[in-house]
Amino acid sequence: MNGQLNGFHEAFIEEGTFLFTSESVGEGHPDKICDQINDAVLDAHLQQDPDAKVACETVAKTGMILLAGEITSRAAIDYQKVVREAIKHIGYDDSSKGFDYKTCNVLVALEQQSPDIAQGVHLDRNEEDIGAGDQGLMFGYATDETEECMPLTIVLAHKLNAKLAELRRNGTLPWLRPDSKTQVTVQYMQDRGAVIPIRVHTIVISVQHDEEVCLDEMRDALKEKLIKAVVPAKYLDEDTIYHLQPSGRFVIGGPQGDAGLTGRKIIVDTYGGWGAHGGGAFSGKDYTKVDRSAAYAARWVAKSLVKGGLCRRVLVQVSYAIGVSHPLSISIFHYGTSQKSERELLEIVKNNFDLRPGVIVRDLDLKKPIYQRTAAYGHFGRDSFPWEVPKKLKY
């Protein structure tokens, strides 16, 4: 594997091509710790009460976790246990790593859901006709550049972080710690509105490590054990640039290095900067919060259109008002990659999908405790989730 290591090299970019970059963060990143704790709490409630109404936020800093939010549920939850188990799973199990699930302080500031919201959204209403939990706009995106119908930039960034966790847990690289960040720049060619990845232009990897390992050993291992295992060789060439541990030292990480907060990695969670984002975070929210459920449904719509051969690339927008069940608007943008007009695609979507929250929850089975798995390595592009299974469209 050739390429430029930790040096600036501006490769010539041919006419008709462009560069695009996406980033991902590992399970031990402080913001991602918060997201995973939120969804661990949500799952704990859904295991006992599938109709629980959960809006949970988390703050993390050295030796401390704060849970805040509004929850109405019949479940009896040991929040101390749920939070500590989530942190243990991530890998912060000793104070030498800067955080320890056994000794951290867990503060709980949870209240009931506002009765004003409850009466406007779901009380005394059939499940199919429950209203949206808030106003907002959500997007779904899909592209035919990968089998997952996800951008290659974010697919590779997530896979690099997931592989780092695997190498840490199986002992291959024992100096690894849970906090990590990756970033991938890909050179693309445009093809009548669709995009085709040509090569990987730049890879950035920063990973928390122990005191003993030397920089050269880390850089060599990241190239040989990580990048070669994850990035297909056809995308790497002598001009690929590598910034591996560019800061030189990353011993202090996780909540000790930076405060963590729910919902600060919404682009990592979705499409890596492609498409669009309505601004709402996912983790810690039950299905009545359309920030989450409608974004999942919009992805389902987008992937179904691409996998159905109706377009090569598509962006779907939906919007809602609090207490209103039907979406206020549905919009389709196909980037010129469809033989059908955007109006025709919109009619196909309306005839095949019911985007009321109470129907989305049924079609995508969103009352099941599946959410902790979504909270790291992206909510989209993994076949184990119902919204990633394309619907066979009738038109």
Swiss-Prot record:
Give residue numbers for the modification (Phosphoserine): S114, S384
Q: What is its EC number?
A: 2.5.1.6
The region called Flexible loop is annotated at 113-125
- Please give the InterPro entries that the UniProt record associates with this protein: ADOMET_SYNTHASE_CS, S-AdoMet_synt_C, S-AdoMet_synt_central, S-AdoMet_synt_N, S-AdoMet_synthetase, S-AdoMet_synthetase_sfam
- Gene3D superfamilies named in the record: 3.30.300.10
One MF term in the entry's GO annotations: ATP binding
The UniProt record gives the binding positions of L-methionine as E70, Q113, D258, K289
Record-linked SUPFAM superfamilies: S-adenosylmethionine synthetase (SSF55973)
What Gene Ontology cellular-component terms does the record carry? cytosol; methionine adenosyltransferase complex
What does the entry comment about cofactor binding?
Answer: Binds 2 magnesium ions per subunit. The magnesium ions interact primarily with the substrate. Binds 1 potassium ion per subunit. The potassium ion interacts primarily with the substrate.
What is one Gene Ontology biological process annotated in the Swiss-Prot or TrEMBL record? Answer: circadian rhythm
Sites where the protein binds ATP: H29, D179, S180, K181, S247, G248, R249, F250, D258, R264, K265, A281, K285, D291
Q: How does it assemble?
A: Heterotrimer; composed of a catalytic MAT2A homodimer that binds one regulatory MAT2B chain. Heterohexamer; composed of a central, catalytic MAT2A homotetramer flanked on either side by a regulatory MAT2B chain.
What protein name does the entry list? Answer: S-adenosylmethionine synthase isoform type-2
Source organism per UniProt: Rattus norvegicus
Q: Gene encoding this polypeptide?
A: Mat2a
